């Protein structure tokens, strides 16, 4: 979940034993290769066209209160040289009684490092609204002071940075999309020394990503990729994927999220402007063996407007 892995049991009584709602990790995307700007502002404008991406993710389908995420992002190069990129993104993220809304502006500046190499510096700035309705929870006792007061649209600022290096066939990115660690408080409910108790925490997420495109034949491209996510106090998360692009139209692939899930991915380039993508995750944890979890899925649409004389003759695989 964007900015948060909350220790919330979805509507079950054991929630009353949890000391606070913890915020640790950003939203989880299987199709992150089409949604790169959300985790690295250096990607803004780097497709050299006006690119608009919409994505919906439903996680752990069948489990009440499970995470749901919607993302809308658009970005484009500016000016004749395209060195400057500008983007905007909005994210809605829900899990159990918690709803989060993010809105960010992304800025990037590109420099040439070689004939084919480019290095892009990115900056992200925006805000975050957190809403927690504890009335939706089923607790052993209604007198639990930790959950007496809801959090209503609590605002937090956000600043992030990113580096993105790329060539026509390779990319490498390093980023931290949220550099501001924030504690949300339920003031006065507990007798702490400062008169407040921590309800939610947002921690810095660090991302390292890389991929390479190999030409297997005139009509077949292969791209292995890896994404690593590091959060202090949370397990290391590593995603590895392998995708094939056939006839510049059809994408098929698979991914593995370390100790978490196996995924299947498919995409279809309907036209030069429109790409449709779908991903499905099978949990490899104990949660995946329950009758309440039917896996997770994502649906993605990407629409791009090309300049009249600057159309991409060969679709970029990233």
Locate predicted features.
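N-terminal secretory signal peptides that target proteins for export/translocation
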Residues: 1-6
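Subset of outer-membrane beta-barrel
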Residues: 24-318
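Bacterial N-terminal signal peptides
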Residues: 9-19
